[in-house]
Design a protein with these regions (language model features):
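Glycine-rich phosphate-binding loop and adjoining beta1-alpha1-beta2 segment
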Residues: 48-56
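FAD-dinucleotide binding site
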Residues: 57-61
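FMN-binding flavodoxin-like domain, especially the glycine-rich phosphate-binding loop
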Residues: 3-18, 23-48, 62, 67-198
Length: 198
């Protein structure tokens, strides 16, 4: 994977790569770390001031209220300086078919002008609205095709699912899928740059 990694780590113009993610149970974090390893990019974890409950219905009701009211969660820690990057990967678990609200906060607060954004997500159900909403919420970004990876489902009862252990069992399969996806979007990125004269 040296060719794909080096191409994203030092894309045309000498830009850098940033891998941003939010993860509750480790599923999305594991994928993010694999992308970071393959691209040689920097890693940034989105963290919230508020801790989300596992118990249902609160686990679903709180994010739903955040989306409907626009009162998105406050993030903890300093934001990365996105201006120094050319390519930004953004990872999220699927919450109610779409981007998790902590990731929505990050997207709201960042201007991606001149940046290329590629999304990835982990799901236990249906991520049908992820790519549409990522595109709509990534201000001024050039969006590449997203990729989805199956994750664990938390019922809110019993032990919390270990997403990292679940993904570790599938590491070879995930690695092959990531390789194919990175090659595909790299070709898309280079083609777009050539078409736009950049």
């Amino acid at each position: 994977m040296g060719q794909v990694g080096s191409a994203f780590a030092t894309p045309r113009g000498g830009g850098k790569t940033l891998v941003v993610f939010y993860s509750k149970s480790g599923n999305t974090q594991t994928i993010a770390e694999m992308i970071q390893e393959k691209t040689g990019g920097d890693l940034y974890e989105i963290q919230t001031v508020r801790t989300y409950p596992r118990e249902r219905p609160a686990a679903a009701d709180i994010p739903k209220e955040e989306r409907e009211t626009g009162n998105l969660p406050e993030l903890r820690g300093a934001m990365p300086d996105v201006s120094q990057y050319e390519t930004v990967f953004i990872g999220s678990p699927i919450w109610e078919y779409t981007v998790a609200t902590p990731v929505m906060t990050f997207l709201r607060d960042v201007d991606f002008r001149g940046k290329t954004v590629a999304g990835f997500y982990t799901f236990a159900g249906d991520g049908r609205h992820f790519e549409r909403d990522l595109r709509n919420q990534s201000r001024n970004a050039h969006i590449l095709e997203s990729a989805g990876f199956r994750g664990t489902y938390d019922t809110g009862r019993g032990p919390e699912p270990d997403g990292r252990a679940y993904q570790a069992k599938r590491k070879e399969e995930i690695g092959r899928r990531l390789d194919a996806w990175l090659k595909k979007i790299l070709m898309e990125k280079v083609t777009d740059e050539q078409y736009n004269g950049t």
